[in-house]
Amino acid sequence: SYDRVKKLIRGLLPGKLKLPSLVQDDVFHMTELGLYFSRSSNGVSRLHEKVAQDQFKWKKIKHITNGVHHIYWMAGSFKDFYDVHLDGWRSNPELLLQVDQIPSPLIYAVHNENKKKLIAYANSQSSKALDPEVLTIGFARRAATYKRAHLIFHDMEKLLDIGQGNLQIIFSGKAHPKDMGGKSIIRNIVQSAKRFDGKIKIIYLENYDMWLGRLITSGVDLWLNT
């Protein structure tokens, strides 16, 4: 609240910064405070830059597009595959745009090898007996409330109608030890999975780390974003 913020930071702010300008509906606007004290500010895409600049006209905002290092995050089997079919892709990642020119069966063959590795590991950690022939959905990231890992269970009847016998889901991710909300989400997923026993196979893999993250992302058929 505004009153609490005044007690905490009064005397620490520059004289030309008017505290009331950072208050909206008696709630302190942390974003504006952060922008004021930042040397530079950026969005994560060109569109994000435009939206943020329209919202905060007094602050110059640029953009740095989110992305990944294509070599680091690609499964080793696909690196070898693209070395054969897209020569030069390592130094010129735009060549990956030509992936649709590679016959699909060849791509599926490599993917299925990665999928078998994932399913083998998952089955070594669970008694659910996941099937490598079934569409596999993956969701693996830090268990924070805003990431909404449990959103897929919002309509259980619809999920059951769509997924019974047709899909299986692999979850993974850790919550901060003091993040009670994050731990509650993990608990919610595990409990929800039990309600689908015998209908849809759902597992939550423990001890999430970079190795497991790579195994899941390279092995699932569909990556779930919420």
Predicted features, each with a name:
Residues 1-226:
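Catalytic cores of carbohydrate-active enzymes across secretory and cytosolic contexts
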